[in-house]
Amino acid sequence: MSEQHAQGADAVVDLNNELKTRREKLANLREQGIAFPNDFRRDHTSDQLHAEFDGKENEELEALNIEVAVAGRMMTRRIMGKASFVTLQDVGGRIQLYVARDDLPEGVYNEQFKKWDLGDILGAKGKLFKTKTGELSIHCTELRLLTKALRPLPDKFHGLQDQEARYRQRYLDLISNDESRNTFKVRSQILSGIRQFMVNRGFMEVETPMMQVIPGGAAARPFITHHNALDLDMYLRIAPELYLKRLVVGGFERVFEINRNFRNEGISVRHNPEFTMMELYMAYADYKDLIELTESLFRTLAQDILGKTEVTYGDVTLDFGKPFEKLTMREAIKKYRPETDMADLDNFDSAKAIVESIGIHVEKSWGLGRIVTEIFEEVAEAHLIQPTFITEYPAEVSPLARRNDVNPEITDRFEFFIGGREIGNGFSELNDAEDQAQRFLDQVAAKDAGDDEAMFYDEDYVTALEHGLPPTAGLGIGIDRMVMLFTNSHTIRDVILFPAMRPVK
């Protein structure tokens, strides 16, 4: 047996022994009728205590004679004869407990406390004081075991090192990893901040179907499910767009939704099949209004959540304080591929030669607009590090966007890039029912030609447009990628609590 295998076998034996010992302790607690009490109530969390009392000297704390009740998980314990120090962790952070034998009811220290294990959940009452080193602590007069942990915590010095285990057992990751806990706190703050921002601008939050008869609103491969009561195959939504615009037709002129989308596609550091989007629709507005809104949203969130408009991402400082850059798709191609002759982007054969020269195979169904878009994605996208809006997307790749009045080959659309990746997509909405019907037919033709991400024909949506959609602009922002930026995370799995994983066999 190799040394590595021997160590692995020893670890399994140690774990089994640990589990056996802890289960025996739980059995003893059951016999005493105190296994899982539910009558302890705390009055503070650790962060509340630190915020209110860290600035006070010990003499002041003694004079105030403040008694508090806290609860949390025992992360460390230092037993020094008749007294011990415990680190208790709760939702707000950590607080130190000072546990002395003679300050607790008889028998609690030796017969109970010393037999408890790291990972157990405790309730503690006592008075605040500061140690000689100035650490805010609680001098315990009551200490109770609230939940017996049967499994040990990850090694306190190394935490949960296996990256895959962090995702599969997120609860252990959250217990042992401060950075991970902070990431999801920031995520919650972002969601709350977006909602407040939208409400302040007069938007109404709505909910639209997660299961749809026709998957629409984006070019993607859907998940299929079956509705037993209706005996009907349905699709998990790939986007809420068409339902939200139906609401604008109905008179709700400013709507937004934050919810999950599902796309049956690949998994990568940037993609998870189940992801969170915020989509909004605003009547009597165009894509330029949404450029302003997007810029203001990111600047506001950065200031409110991080306290500054400069965000560190990897080795780069992203500046949300200054005006965001704005380039047309063709300008971006020229900027990052200077040898490009702009006239070549107006000619199918010339553009095809360019895209093939950079290693992209041209499908038979592609027109000039798709080819130019592929060139942009290959030569420019990765360079868009600072916040940048790219405009003038071809109509061919924008089946739901309004054509430009001057040049009908392009649309009044933008995509928003930060850190070399798309974060948002917005455009003036197509509200010409006949034009929309034709574009749906074009998408059906592309699907028949083998493009399994092309859109279905949605007759009811066309009917809704025939009743009249006001001039409207719409925007979608990827929440997961936004959280990645604000938390300096470099894989989408780090910002999704339970990312998609292949089951363990």
From Swiss-Prot:
Mg(2+) 2 binds at E422. One of its GO terms (biological process) is lysyl-tRNA aminoacylation. Binds 3 Mg(2+) ions per subunit. It catalyses: tRNA(Lys) + L-lysine + ATP = L-lysyl-tRNA(Lys) + AMP + diphosphate. The keyword Cytoplasm applies. The keyword Aminoacyl-tRNA synthetase applies. Homodimer. This is Lysine--tRNA ligase.
